[in-house]
Amino acid sequence: MGRRVGGGMASCCAAYYQERCKALITMSAQSMVEELTLSGIREAKEIFKQDGQLDRLKKYHGEKAQWVLDAWTETWLSEAFKHWTLDEYLQKIQCPMLIIHGELDEYGSLNQPQQYIKSSPAPSQLYIMENTHHMPHKEKPEEVLAVVTQFLEKLTDFTQLNHTANEQV
């Protein structure tokens, strides 16, 4: 499971470790560069220049907070990153996927989660959360928990059914 950039990282893990990855869940994950993402990053870059804002990142990244911020913003805003996509990895994913995305996500349009579905041959469930922005787990934690639980329960039932069928062979 991964959120935002972590969703991309989780996707790469699912692509590389197909035999070991049983499921992939992403939330608010980018699958490509688009202007909505870039404008959100430009805005965040300006916000983090304000007094006290970098301290929010220091809570998670300590003294490397500025480096983390610069690595994120400068990579995404660079000309070299302009045509980046996850497509080559998404095409390799075989495990079931749950793709969660806020309808009003200010960093990524609905094209982001739809690209996951379009580019991967894996069985997938796209869950668009209505009236939700970039932080579904904070905005509607109960709904996120419910949809993830339901997905994992179905996966468990399928895995047990598949395991039982294999034992009978």
What does each of the following model-derived ranges do?
Residues 95, 109-118:
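Short alpha-helix in the alpha/beta-hydrolase fold that links the catalytic acid
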Residues 1-35:
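Conserved hydrolase catalytic core segment
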Residues 37-62:
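A catalytic-pocket lid/entrance helix-loop region that shapes and gates access to the active site
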Residues 33, 106-107, 135-138:
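A short, basic/aromatic alpha-helical/loop segment that forms part
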Residues 93, 99-101, 105:
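Short beta-strand/loop motif that positions the catalytic acidic residue
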Residues 124-125, 130-169:
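Catalytic active-site module of serine/aspartate enzymes centered on a nucleophile-bearing elbow/loop
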Residues 35-40, 111-112, 139-141:
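Short aromatic-enriched loop/helix-cap "lid" or pocket-rim segments at secondary-structure transitions
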Residues 72-89:
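Active-site nucleophile elbow and catalytic-triad environment of alpha/beta-hydrolase enzymes
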